[in-house]
From Swiss-Prot:
Pfam families: Pectinesterase (PF01095)
Purpose: Acts in the modification of cell walls via demethylesterification of cell wall pectin.
Signal peptide: 1-19
Glycosylation, residue list: N100, N113, N140, N156, N163, N182, N295, N350, N369, N378
Site (Transition state stabilizer): Q222
Upper lineage: Eukaryota, Viridiplantae, Streptophyta, Embryophyta, Tracheophyta
The species this protein was found in: Arabidopsis thaliana
Biological process annotations from GO: cell wall modification; pectin catabolic process
EC number from the UniProt entry: 3.1.1.11
Active site positions, chain numbering: D223 (proton donor), D244 (nucleophile)
Protein known as: Probable pectinesterase 8
Phosphoprotein in keyword set: no
Pathway membership, UniProt: Glycan metabolism; pectin degradation; 2-dehydro-3-deoxy-D-gluconate from pectin: step 1/5
A GO MF label: pectinesterase activity
Length: 393
């Protein structure tokens, strides 16, 4: 029962997070929030119903049991990708038991160590309440959902409950050449109050090299996406949080992503800042890391910086990105350490919208030129020509 009551409380927390009035007001159904909220409510009810039903397996209702099982799987898609057995293995996950695995972790566990072929874990729609670890010994794994608004992995650890921010992620990826498509990663721990200690609640930690995320969602409040280390590519993703919600020391390109601040709504005219999109962890000039955001949109609630200098050589750029007035006029923060002004690299180029006004930006912010930008805006920034195979995506 413990698991079930946990899953119900997680589900309620998710619905609270996703159906928060401010989110609906700011981001209508175009962002799939209603769909997520509805489908996850539905999956929660299914989960509860299925569990309740489970108690009757010992009664003499075998025919209806079978009938119910068949009806659950009737809708199961028959068009799982064709098997190209030379190069790809397919594993199938469905929480209702309609294929080989009912949890994502059990499918990951079934992949052989150091497999040279691509292992596609096809995950049917639904909410999977579990922590998932993809170890270093398992490269070449793809998690393929059915849409970030209908397939998600969720858990609710915080830094306090999991012995630190580095271990509280719902999903931890250490294997290289990891790919995720059309799936959400969620940490549904309650949104922290300002000043809460140990409230960091990470949705995913990406610590393997050469990883790509396409059409994915990342949901949490504080420290949502731990872009820890390695070269990573994000395209058409939806990233939501409030404080330092994209953080780490990876070298990553974010293209065509929607970035949504969930920071508290401030009273009109308030100059307070209550969040930051990025906290990049580059700590020396010798580290070839940094975040590049190209053709993204930034909106949401509260008043946030584009980045704050978590480490002295923090490096982040925004190019051709649309920003609402959720971005504070100064744009960036040096972690209240003026000695970092000379070493951080924060730049903007060709951005638009009320939040992109450069006239009041902090003095250390660089107005980039076309030559500088050319090296930062496409997949060559992350050496994509060496590893990023669009056929895998």
């Amino acid at each position: 029962m413990k698991i079930i009551s946990l899953s119900i409380s997680i589900g309620i927390a998710i619905i609270a997070v996703l159906a928060s009035k401010t989110l609906f007001k700011t981001h209508p159904e175009a962002f799939g929030i209603k769909a997520i909220s509805y489908s996850f409510k539905k999956s929660l009810c299914d989960h509860h119903h299925h569990h309740h039903h489970h108690h009757h397996h010992h009664h003499r209702h075998k025919p209806s049991d079978t009938k119910r099982k068949v009806s659950i799987c009737d809708d199961f898609p028959k068009n799982i990708p064709p098997l190209d057995t030379d190069t790809t293995s397919y594993l199938c996950v469905d929480k209702n038991g309609c294929c080989n695995f009912t949890t994502v972790q059990s499918a990951v566990d079934a992949v052989g160590n150091f497999s040279q072929r691509r292992n596609v874990i096809w995950i049917n729609s639904g909410m999977y309440y579990e922590k998932v670890v993809i170890p270093k010994t398992k490269p070449n794994i793809t998690l393929q959902g059915q849409g970030f608004d209908i397939t998600a992995i969720a858990w609710n650890d915080t830094a306090y409950s999991a012995n630190g921010t580095f271990y509280c992620a719902t999903v931890q990826v250490f294997g290289s050449q990891f790919v995720a498509k059309n799936i959400s990663f969620m940490n549904v721990a309650p949104i922290p109050k300002p000043g809460d200690v140990g409230a960091q609640a990470v949705a995913i930690r990406i610590a393997g090299d050469e990883s790509a995320f396409v059409g994915c969602g990342f949901f949490g409040a504080q420290d949502t996406l731990h872009d820890d280390r390695g070269r990573h590519y994000f395209k058409d993703c939806y990233i939501q949080g409030s404080i330092d919600f994209i953080f780490g020391n990876a070298k990553s390109l974010y293209q065509d992503c929607r970035i949504i601040s969930m920071a508290n709504q401030l009273s009109p005219g308030s100059k307070a800042v209550n969040g930051a999109v990025t906290a990049n962890g580059r700590s020396s000039k010798d580290e070839n890391s940094g975040f590049s955001f190209v053709n993204c949109t930034i909106g949401g609630t509260g008043h946030v910086w584009l980045g704050r200098a978590w480490r002295p050589y923090s490096r982040v750029v925004f190019v051709s990105t649309t920003m609402t007035d959720v971005i504070a006029p100064e744009g960036w923060n040096n972690f209240n350490d003026p000695s970092r002004d000379a070493t951080i690299f924060y730049g903007e180029y060709n951005c638009s919208g009320p939040g992109a006004d450069m006239s009041k930006r902090a003095p250390y912010v660089q107005k980039l030129n076309e030559t500088q930008v050319a090296l930062l805006i496409n997949t060559s920034f992350i050496d994509g020509d060496q590893w990023l195979q669009f056929s895998d995506l």
